[in-house]
Curated annotation (Swiss-Prot), chain B:
Name of the protein in question: Transcription initiation factor TFIID subunit 6
Record GO cellular component, one term: transcription factor TFIID complex
Taxonomic source organism: Arabidopsis thaliana (Mouse-ear cress)
Name of one Pfam family that matches: TAF
Subunit structure as annotated in this protein's UniProt entry: Component of the TFIID complex. TFIID is composed of TATA binding protein (TBP) and a number of TBP-associated factors (TAFs) whose MWs range from 14-217 kDa.
UniProt function note: TAFs are components of the transcription factor IID (TFIID) complex that is essential for mediating regulation of RNA polymerase transcription. Required for proper pollen function. May stabilize the interaction of TFIID with selected promoters. Not redundant with TAF6B.
């Protein structure tokens, strides 16, 4: 290439970039000394690649159609590549796609950006639907600046794991087609982690889903931290096991005969069912059965969870409460895929579309509902059960003033909030109700006095969720202001503020040992925070839409999270890895709950079903089984469809069954 | 560009008083408007999710505006969903249906009902992992369960194992329900309540677990209570309600039900009192049988053949009582005219010769016997008539009958109407019909005459049928029912024919068929005419009649 040409390129380039004066200077300079020998420090003549590269710089730099061409070429190449490497190569497509789009928007080609986006969005809708919906609205450079999601995408690089050969294939393609534009985007925004060997199977794609690369790094870094997921020392379960031994000794003579009974009990209960005796009888039967099972419990817990010390000063439990809990624990029936639980279903009727949340106290005797008209209503199920014989209820009304302060009402009305109530939960003994609302406050109510005790102000935006710690006294809240906070009942200021989520914190849950809380967010991650230090100790990445519900297994080892799409993920807390996604729901998973032994997971969803999952088998599944892909079906034990009633809240009570409630709209 | 066109921005600008908005400014604003709307929607969806809903409401949008520190738009949070209307002439332009309300109407309107207060109801969604079949639960599982049992039945028959959970969860409510129904069926004291019960049986969704109990109950009571006419009738009503219930999967229990129904059809003696109208019961049972055959004939291929065999055996056994014959004829007739043609008409001649002595008052001294014989004769005539009617109806509709023909038909009515009077005399002495009913039958011919004059078209065609069918007319106790029956017979026959002859015959095929069948039918008609005399004529559709005559 002769210097004349080079000059032309340079001038053309400068003009394109808007340095017209510089271009003029250069031109005039060249006119002055026409020999132009000073430019040849690089040997352009022998490097055609470089020539092309430079030429392409000067050629229509701004032409929006180049994005489209480049992308569609890359796309067809990727789709026609070798099957073995195809899924890896296809991973590149999404980052390239969104950055092409954002480049186009950034340069002001709104029209072209739109058509480009629409023509290729189908490719990515499967996995990235939510992100696409967000990006779709970005139409001007200022939006790019404003929107946090877009900003973080622009700033960070995406990590993509590539096997050696895929990487070479890609480079080869980019060089041979001289698609400098694509090359530029890929260089700028993608960070390849090349590893030697065969490409990974496409099923491991979950990690490829999250796009924010630097974020992934920090996540990996954070996830290195050590956590103590064990149960508390000297917990009631511990004491139960100790006393359980004693009990079974003292009851040995009795116990043996009962053991025989227990085997028969299955049969017996079915017989009773046939004869159609009352439910109460059934319960009693099960309770009798349960005592026999306590003895077995010891043998089953072969590898007990490690014990840890509490980092918080925990409240002292009164002996009465302790006794009753111990009693409950003793009566607990071990649930498994063979011994299925009973499900009692509470339906809210005539809610006029206003029920936002509901919850059930730990002993199942109280049910609370939070409504969009700022009210909270608490029902005492025992009283409803007593007066259940219909006609009697009406007669009792006048005499029962204390229970029904407003005459005919069957519930206690708690008024105080000034916005929709988004959560209402009971303290473990059931003497307090904690509610959070769109009016940015959290309120504490007493179920004994039926009155508001404290109003906690601290959040700046609607408080989406508030949860008591497993031992009461402390509680956690989370809000639209992207923080989660820890409070104690006796202070009106938060004790800790957990900040770090990139979007709303939608749900919060305590770890059984009280040292950690987990939060689920609209940024599609779940985080685990240390309560004592307020630091984030785990980030769980894998959900494809906003996380709506969380549950911790009773042994503290696992966590389940449910999202907007109906996917439930089981996480191992120590490794921060997803054990298994549980697919089955096709709409929002509103609530999750583990059974007392941690062997079953119940999920309630907006698709009007309650599903039971066998989580013991899923954790023990071998790799081979998982590869078969049908493991999902094995894990899903039962589906209970309701009569078009979305399921809002679930609680596995201490005794033996799941309680669920919901609303008819 | 953006989904908000610049015209929209201009229109909105005008509506808030900005008239001099530059087109460029509108063009710049449009994408921003879209972005803001999307932003609001994103927040609104969050609010919706936290309200645990899957439909976005106006209050969610208000909530989202609050989050952005924007004043909410008032006047939309009405609770109910909006009604959108399509703008006429535009494909995707919608507006809210916001009617003007007259102030006066609002003031004068009565107070609306107070909204019901929120309540909690409780039920078992599952008991030890099994969903009980109660009305509160979705009926999905309930319907599926028997299908599974059927498969098992065919395979290796561990029937008990599979059905157990359904029995097992028979709730207290269901037991009470069953008891109540059983009591009602036995007591026969409270007809309106019983009717309610039947409606509930025919429509309730949670009754499936009770089906085996009901079939058992019916089978037991039918075999024990053959003397109790009312009870039998009640039981048959239960059967019909169960068959009608769309939530019940009755197939596996049919084998238990069929004997009871057939018993009510062809039993020698139903009810012990003289007044018991067992004919009606037999007719009812016949309808049930045909209903069952129609619905489940495709699943149980042997069902109809077994049934017809039973009925034909009953019919052709001269030792069997006339009541049994009657039941058999009605049962066969209800199965459609193909069955009648194949099974009754072929045996018609010998049977009639057998029946002849019984009909004759001189030869048969027992009045009751004569009455029964006439009943049978009537049933036979009706069956044959409907059959020939159905056959002739296959022909494509011919031009509507000319008025002159109607007169002819009436003329015949008059001619034959001498017959019934004769017969009625014999019947009246033995029959203890209610006076009112007799009155109707007596009035029959005269009424027709008067109506003939007034000339109400549909009645004219049908009334002769009634007249010309003396045995039915004179002895049918519920004359009103029978009358309507006769009235419907024509239209219904058309339907029966259509469904019966479901092999889709194209128009051309029909025409071919006609010419082939023409002779055949003609012969059949002649034969029937020989046997029945003019009594068969009213069954023949008028137009065809004109052809044959």
């Amino acid at each position: 290439m002769d210097p004349e040409q080079i000059n032309e390129f340079v001038v053309g380039y400068l003009k394109k970039k808007g340095f017209s004066s510089a271009a003029k200077d250069l031109e005039s300079y060249h006119h002055q000394n026409n020999n132009g020998s000073s430019f040849t420090s690089v040997d352009y003549h022998n490097d055609p690649e470089l020539t092309k590269l430079i030429r392409s710089f000067s050629q229509q730099e701004d032409d929006p159609t180049r994005y489209r061409e480049g992308y569609s070429k890359l796309r067809s190449w990727a789709y026609n590549s070798l099957d073995l490497y195809k899924h890896e190569l296809l991973r590149v497509m999404y980052p390239v796609f969104i950055h092409c789009y954002m480049d186009l928007v950034g340069k002001g080609h709104t029209q072209e950006a739109r058509t480009f986006f629409n023509s290729f969005r189908k490719d990515h809708e499967m996995v990235h639907l939510r992100d696409l919906q967000k990006l779709e609205g970005v139409l001007s450079p200022s939006h790019l600046e404003e929107m946090e999601f877009a900003r973080s995408l622009r700033k960070s690089k995406v990590n993509i794991k590539f096997c050696q050969y895929s990487y070479e294939l890609l480079l080869q393609y980019l060089h041979s087609t001289v698609s400098t534009l694509m090359l530029g985007i890929i260089n700028e925004h993608i960070n390849f982690q090349v590893y030697s060997g065969q490409p990974t199977s496409s099923s491991d794609d979950i990690e490829a889903v999250t796009i924010v690369g630097s974020f992934q790094d920090t996540a990996n870094h954070i996830n290195q931290k050590e956590i103590q997921w064990g149960l508390l020392e000297d917990s009631l379960e511990d004491r139960l096991e100790k006393t359980g031994g004693l009990l079974s000794d003292s009851e040995k003579g009795q116990g043996e005969s009962k053991d025989g009974d227990a085997d028969d009990s299955k049969k017996r209960s079915t017989e009773i069912g046939k004869q159609g005796s009352s439910l109460k009888k059934l319960k009693k039967d099960k309770a009798g059965n349960a005592t026999a099972k306590v003895a077995r419990l010891e043998t089953i817990t072969v590898s007990p969870a490690p014990r840890v010390k509490p980092e918080l000063a925990l409240p002292v439990m009164s002996t009465d409460v302790e006794q009753s809990i111990l009693e409950d624990l003793r009566n607990r029936v071990q649930l498994s895929s063979v011994a299925m639980p009973s499900v009692s279903f509470y339906t809210f009727v005539n809610t006029h579309n206003g029920l936002n949340c509901s919850s059930i106290s730990h002993d199942g005797s109280l049910v609370a509902g939070g409504f969009s008209d700022s009210s909270i209503k608490v029902w005492d199920m025992a009283k409803i059960g007593q007066a259940g014989s219909g006609a009697l209820q009406a007669e009792n009304d006048s005499s029962d003033q204390s229970i029904r302060p407003n005459g005919r009402r069957s519930y206690t009305l708690l008024l105080g909030h000034s916005g929709p109530v988004y959560s209402a939960t009971f303290s473990p003994p059931g003497d307090f109700v904690l509610s959070s609302s769109a009016d940015t406050t959290i309120r504490l109510w007493s179920t004994k006095l039926n009155a508001n005790l404290v109003c906690y102000k601290g959040h700046n935006y609607p408080v989406w969720d508030a949860q008591f710690s497993p031992f009461g006294h402390y509680f956690a809240s989370c809000s639209h202001d992207r923080t989660a906070r820890i409070w104690s009942m006796d202070r009106i200021q938060p004790l800790r503020i957990m900040a770090g989520h990139l979007s709303d914190v939608d749900c919060v849950q305590w770890h059984p040992n009280c040292n950690y809380i987990a939060t689920g967010s609209s940024d599609k991650t779940v985080r685990l925070w240390d309560v004592q230090t307020g630091e984030c100790v785990r980030i769980f990445i894998g959900h494809r839409s906003m996380v709506l519900s969380l549950a911790m297994s009773p042994d503290g080892r696992y966590m389940a999270s449910g999202d907007e799409d109906g996917t439930i993920m089981m996480w191992d807390l120590s490794t921060a890895r997803c054990i298994t996604p549980l697919m089955g729901h096709n709409s929002c998973v509103w609530s999750l709950s583990y059974s007392g032994e941690g062997s079953l997971l119940a999920s309630g969803s907006a698709d009007c079903t309650v599903k039971l999952w066998d989580v013991t088998s899923s954790t023990k599944l071998t790799k081979a089984e998982e590869k078969n892909g049908n493991s999902n079906r094995l894990r899903s034990l039962r589906t209970f469809p309701t009569k078009s009633t979305p399921v809002h809240a679930l609680r596995v009570s201490y005794a033996f069954f799941t309680r669920i409630n919901s609303t008819i709209l | 560009m953006s989904i908000v066109p610049k015209e929209t921005v201009e229109v909105i600008a005008q509506s808030i008083g900005i008239t001099n908005l530059l087109p460029e400014a509108a063009l710049m604003l449009a994408p921003d408007v879209e972005y803001r709307v999307r932003e609001i929607m994103q927040e609104a969806i969050k609010c919706m999710r936290h309200s645990k809903r899957t439909t976005l409401t106006a209050s969610d949008v208000d909530g989202a505006l609050n989050l952005r520190n924007v004043e909410p738009i008032y006047g939309f949070a009405s609770g109910g969903p909006f009604r959108f209307r399509k703008a006429i002439g535009h494909r995707d332009l919608f507006y809210t249906d916001d009617r003007e309300v007259d102030f006066k109407d609002v003031i004068e309107a009565p107070l609306p009902k107070a909204p019901l207060d929120t309540e909690i109801v409780c039920h078992w969604l599952a008991i030890e992992g099994v969903q009980p079949a109660i009305p509160e639960n979705a009926p999905l599982e309930v319907i599926r369960a028997p299908a599974e049992t059927k498969i098992h039945e065919q395979k290796d028959g561990p029937l008990i194992d599979v059905r157990l959970p359904v029995k097992h969860v028979l709730s207290r409510e269901l037991q009470l329900y069953f008891q109540k129904i059983a009591e009602l069926a036995m007591s026969k004291s409270n007809p309106p309540l019983y009717k309610e019960a039947l409606v509930s049986l025919a429509s309730d969704s949670g009754l499936h677990p009770l089906v085996p109990y009901f079939t058992n109950f019916i089978a037991d009571e039918v075999s024990n209570g053959l003397n109790d006419f009312r009870l039998l009738f009640n039981l048959m009503h239960i059967v019909r309600s169960l068959l009608q219930n769309p939530h019940i999967h009755i197939e596996p229990y049919l084998h238990q039900l069929m004997p009871s129904v057939v018993t009510c059809l062809v039993s020698r003696k139903l009810g012990n009192r003289f007044a018991d109208n067992h004919w009606e019961l037999r007719d009812f049972a016949a309808n049930l049988v045909s209903l069952i055959c129609k619905r489940y004939g495709t699943v149980y291929i042997t069902l109809q053949s077994r049934l017809t065999r039973t009925l034909v055996n009953a019919l052709l056994d001269p030792k069997k009582a006339l009541t049994q014959h009657y039941g058999a004829i009605q049962g066969l007739a209800a199965l459609g005219h193909t069955v009648v043609r194949l099974l009754i008409l072929s045996n018609l001649e010998p049977y009639l010769s057998l029946l002849e002595p019984e009909l004759n008052a001189e030869k048969q001294k027992n009045q009751m016997k004569i009455y029964e014989a006439w009943r049978v004769y009537g049933a036979l005539l009706r069956a044959a008539g409907l059959c020939i009617h159905g056959r002739l109806k296959i022909f494509p509709p011919l031009p509507s009958p000319s008025p002159s023909f109607l007169h002819k038909g009436k003329g015949k009515g008059k001619i034959i109407s001498t017959d019934p009077h004769k017969r009625k005399l014999s019947v009246d002495s033995s029959e203890n019909q209610s006076p009112q009913k007799r009155l109707i039958t007596m009035d029959g011919p005269d009424g027709v005459h008067s109506q003939d004059q007034s000339g109400s078209a549909p009645m004219q065609v049908d009334n002769p049928v009634e007249n010309d069918n003396p045995p039915q007319n004179s002895v049918q106790p519920s004359s009103s029912e029978q009358a309507s029956d006769a009235n419907e017979s024509e239209s219904r026959n058309g339907k029966v024919k259509e469904s019966g002859r479901s092999r889709a015959i194209t128009m051309k095929a029909i025409l071919d068929q006609i010419w082939k069948d023409d002779l055949d039918s003609g012969r059949l008609l002649v034969k029937l005419h020989e046997l029945y005399g003019d009594r068969i004529l009213p069954f023949i559709p008028s137009t065809e009649m004109s052809v044959f005559l």
